[in-house]
């Protein structure tokens, strides 16, 4: 079984990391971006550009507040909890994520590097005062759109919009160069520079395991490709590792 193979690779790895995309959160009720039912099938990606935010902050927030409310009702699924458990076991050193939903942290993962920010945080573009997103949504309900800081500046979500550089890419690539195994989970692996993370691990001689519903451009260089539902597959990996650990200690 692929589950056993992945478990064995994790057990023999000395520095394994996870790289996650929107596909890990679909079982939590959050749509991915580019899949058959993805967000960009329903909305124009232009709504998530820095140019649109600057041109029409009110229109931008009409879209983003709906997205925020959808994210805030979501809870971690079994895949998030499985990764948190693998981290507690010492088998996953870090999670590098493209996601902005904060579900890895809610599931208990501690070393999470967010490339695209976190929708649960906001800040003023003028004075840089920070806000939690619940406060901003309350402000919208009371004062209308766009939400404004006490200084008069427009508040924006602390996420990377199209047209902006990603966060933490240098530290993420540094981790990737150290890793000897990467689990690429729920990502189309088409977005640059984030897709350099799994590619870097492979180029440095590490193993690449891809868990994704759709084909990716890196499938042909992966050591293992899994098409199963990640919220079912990852708990299976955890159970296998526990059984092996129990067997070895008895």
Swiss-Prot record:
<feature type="binding site">
    <location>
        <position position="212"/>
    </location>
    <ligand>
        <name>NAD(+)</name>
    </ligand>
</feature>
<feature type="active site" description="Proton acceptor">
    <location>
        <position position="116"/>
    </location>
</feature>
<keyword id="KW-0808">Transferase</keyword>
<dbReference type="InterPro" id="IPR050134">
    <property type="entry name" value="NAD-dep_sirtuin_deacylases"/>
</dbReference>
<dbReference type="GO" id="GO:0008270">
    <property type="term" value="F:zinc ion binding"/>
</dbReference>
<dbReference type="GO" id="GO:0070403">
    <property type="term" value="F:NAD+ binding"/>
</dbReference>
<feature type="binding site">
    <location>
        <position position="124"/>
    </location>
    <ligand>
        <name>Zn(2+)</name>
    </ligand>
</feature>
<dbReference type="InterPro" id="IPR026591">
    <property type="entry name" value="Sirtuin_cat_small_dom_sf"/>
</dbReference>
<feature type="binding site">
    <location>
        <position position="33"/>
    </location>
    <ligand>
        <name>NAD(+)</name>
    </ligand>
</feature>
<dbReference type="GO" id="GO:0017136">
    <property type="term" value="F:histone deacetylase activity, NAD-dependent"/>
</dbReference>
<feature type="binding site">
    <location>
        <position position="33"/>
    </location>
    <ligand>
        <name>nicotinamide</name>
    </ligand>
</feature>
<protein>
    <recommendedName>
        <fullName>NAD-dependent protein deacetylase</fullName>
        <ecNumber>2.3.1.286</ecNumber>
    </recommendedName>
</protein>
<dbReference type="Pfam" id="PF02146">
    <property type="entry name" value="SIR2"/>
</dbReference>
<dbReference type="InterPro" id="IPR028628">
    <property type="entry name" value="Sirtuin_class_U"/>
</dbReference>
<feature type="binding site">
    <location>
        <position position="22"/>
    </location>
    <ligand>
        <name>NAD(+)</name>
    </ligand>
</feature>
<feature type="binding site">
    <location>
        <position position="100"/>
    </location>
    <ligand>
        <name>NAD(+)</name>
    </ligand>
</feature>
<dbReference type="InterPro" id="IPR026590">
    <property type="entry name" value="Ssirtuin_cat_dom"/>
</dbReference>
<feature type="binding site">
    <location>
        <position position="149"/>
    </location>
    <ligand>
        <name>Zn(2+)</name>
    </ligand>
</feature>
<keyword id="KW-0805">Transcription regulation</keyword>
<feature type="binding site">
    <location>
        <position position="187"/>
    </location>
    <ligand>
        <name>NAD(+)</name>
    </ligand>
</feature>
<feature type="binding site">
    <location>
        <position position="188"/>
    </location>
    <ligand>
        <name>NAD(+)</name>
    </ligand>
</feature>
<feature type="binding site">
    <location>
        <position position="230"/>
    </location>
    <ligand>
        <name>NAD(+)</name>
    </ligand>
</feature>
<feature type="binding site">
    <location>
        <position position="127"/>
    </location>
    <ligand>
        <name>Zn(2+)</name>
    </ligand>
</feature>
<feature type="binding site">
    <location>
        <position position="100"/>
    </location>
    <ligand>
        <name>nicotinamide</name>
    </ligand>
</feature>
<comment type="function">
    <text>NAD-dependent protein deacetylase which modulates the activities of several enzymes which are inactive in their acetylated form. Deacetylates the N-terminal lysine residue of Alba, the major archaeal chromatin protein and that, in turn, increases Alba's DNA binding affinity, thereby repressing transcription.</text>
</comment>
<feature type="binding site">
    <location>
        <position position="101"/>
    </location>
    <ligand>
        <name>nicotinamide</name>
    </ligand>
</feature>
<feature type="binding site">
    <location>
        <position position="116"/>
    </location>
    <ligand>
        <name>NAD(+)</name>
    </ligand>
</feature>
<feature type="binding site">
    <location>
        <position position="98"/>
    </location>
    <ligand>
        <name>NAD(+)</name>
    </ligand>
</feature>
<feature type="binding site">
    <location>
        <position position="34"/>
    </location>
    <ligand>
        <name>NAD(+)</name>
    </ligand>
</feature>
<keyword id="KW-0862">Zinc</keyword>
<dbReference type="InterPro" id="IPR003000">
    <property type="entry name" value="Sirtuin"/>
</dbReference>
<feature type="domain" description="Deacetylase sirtuin-type">
    <location>
        <begin position="1"/>
        <end position="244"/>
    </location>
</feature>
<dbReference type="InterPro" id="IPR029035">
    <property type="entry name" value="DHS-like_NAD/FAD-binding_dom"/>
</dbReference>
<keyword id="KW-0804">Transcription</keyword>
<comment type="similarity">
    <text>Belongs to the sirtuin family. Class U subfamily.</text>
</comment>
<keyword id="KW-0479">Metal-binding</keyword>
<keyword id="KW-0963">Cytoplasm</keyword>
<keyword id="KW-0520">NAD</keyword>
<feature type="binding site">
    <location>
        <position position="101"/>
    </location>
    <ligand>
        <name>NAD(+)</name>
    </ligand>
</feature>
<dbReference type="GO" id="GO:0005737">
    <property type="term" value="C:cytoplasm"/>
</dbReference>
<feature type="binding site">
    <location>
        <position position="151"/>
    </location>
    <ligand>
        <name>Zn(2+)</name>
    </ligand>
</feature>
<feature type="binding site">
    <location>
        <position position="26"/>
    </location>
    <ligand>
        <name>NAD(+)</name>
    </ligand>
</feature>
């Amino acid at each position: 079984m692929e589950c056993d193979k992945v478990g064995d690779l994790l057990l023999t790895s000395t520095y394994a990391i996870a790289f996650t995309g929107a596909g890990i959160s679909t079982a939590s009720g959050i749509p991915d971006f580019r899949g058959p039912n993805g967000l960009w099938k329903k909305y124009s990606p232009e709504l998530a550009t820095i140019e649109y935010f600057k041109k029409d902050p009110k229109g931008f927030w009409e879209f983003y507040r709906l997205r925020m409310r959808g994210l805030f009702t979501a809870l971690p699924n079994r895949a998030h909890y499985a990764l948190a458990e693998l981290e507690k076991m010492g088998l996953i050193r870090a999670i590098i994520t493209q996601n902005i939903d904060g579900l890895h942290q809610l599931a208990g993962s501690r070393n999470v590097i967010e490339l695209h920010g976190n929708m649960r945080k906001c800040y003023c573009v003028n004075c840089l005062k920070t806000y939690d997103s619940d406060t901003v949504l309350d402000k919208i309900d009371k004062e209308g759109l766009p939400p404004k800081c006490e200084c008069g500046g427009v508040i924006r979500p602390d996420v990377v919009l199209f047209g902006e550089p990603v966060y933490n890419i240098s530290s993420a690539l540094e981790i990737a160069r150290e890793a000897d195994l990467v689990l690429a989970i729920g990502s189309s692996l088409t977005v640059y520079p984030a897709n350099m993370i799994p590619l870097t691990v492979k180029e440095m001689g590490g193993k690449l395991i891809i868990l994704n519903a759709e084909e990716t451009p890196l499938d042909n260089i992966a050591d293992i490709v899994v098409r199963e539902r990640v919220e079912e597959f990852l708990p299976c990996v955890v159970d296998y590792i526990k059984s092996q650990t129990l067997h070895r200690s008895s």
